[in-house]
């Protein structure tokens, strides 16, 4: 049975030079394909809310993005403003330096405070796997589960590399049924998307969403 990819996809536009017209195009595409969410920076939340008001498409906002190095209080403020402006899901970046320092209390508290501010909204934590060792990825996943987060996510897409199959399998194994896995960064093709899902991802962050859907439609027509 063919996987319906559209509801796996957070249709993503996070580049700093994004214009209003770019965001309009993003939202129109999301409506056309009925994607799970659009993933945008918080300055666009209200604008997207209006554009998407008659659709089933949600809004994901990034927080502490892309470095994760701001104060927890700043992340909490971002979350509260994002939700106030209409966002549905939060993708936060964890404090990577603190994880490497083994300051697990700080990392855990950072995630817990964001989740507390988000309340019943879905929170995904971005690990930025390309900067982490295997052991650090495992520990970050364990802390995310302890913090009560719904997803662990591979990458911001702003660093040296993004999602890979080995990391998705590892993250899925660690979180088991206690959280889900989002693959992001470098998920550009239909084959990438299917491979990530087969490895254990239940959400995909990609700016190549339309190309992926067109490829699926072409396959369905044969």
Curated annotation (Swiss-Prot):
Q: What is its EC class?
A: lyase
Q: In which pathway does it act?
A: Carbohydrate degradation; 2-deoxy-D-ribose 1-phosphate degradation; D-glyceraldehyde 3-phosphate and acetaldehyde from 2-deoxy-alpha-D-ribose 1-phosphate: step 2/2
Q: Does the keyword Thylakoid apply?
A: no
Q: Does the keyword Lyase apply?
A: yes
Pfam families, per the entry? DeoC
Protein role: Catalyzes a reversible aldol reaction between acetaldehyde and D-glyceraldehyde 3-phosphate to generate 2-deoxy-D-ribose 5-phosphate.
Please identify the protein, giving its name as recorded: Deoxyribose-phosphate aldolase
Q: What species was this sequence derived from?
A: Mycoplasma capricolum subsp. capricolum (strain California kid / ATCC 27343 / NCTC 10154)
């Amino acid at each position: 049975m063919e996987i319906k990819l559209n509801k796996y996809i957070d249709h993503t536009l996070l580049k700093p030079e994004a214009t209003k017209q770019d965001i309009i195009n993003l939202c129109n595409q999301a409506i056309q394909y009925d994607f799970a969410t659009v993933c945008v920076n918080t300055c666009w939340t209200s604008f997207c809310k209006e554009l998407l008001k008659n659709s089933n498409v949600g809004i994901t906002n990034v927080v502490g993005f892309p470095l994760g190095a701001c104060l927890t209080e700043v992340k909490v403020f971002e979350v509260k403003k994002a939700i106030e402006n209409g966002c549905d899901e939060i993708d936060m970046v964890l404090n990577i330096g603190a994880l490497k320092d083994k300051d697990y209390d700080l990392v855990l508290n950072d995630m817990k405070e964001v989740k507390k501010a988000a309340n019943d909204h879905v929170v995904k934590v971005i690990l930025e796997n390309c900067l982490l060792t295997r052991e650090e990825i495992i520990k970050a996943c364990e802390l995310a589960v302890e913090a009560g987060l719904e997803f662990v996510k591979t990458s911001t897409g702003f660093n040296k590399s993004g999602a890979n199959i080995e990391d998705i399998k590892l993250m899925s194994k660690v979180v088991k049924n206690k959280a889900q896995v989002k693959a992001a960064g470098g998920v550009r093709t239909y084959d990438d998307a299917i491979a990530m899902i087969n490895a254990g991802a239940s959400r995909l962050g990609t700016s190549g969403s339309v190309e992926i859907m067109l490829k699926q439609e072409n396959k369905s027509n044969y």
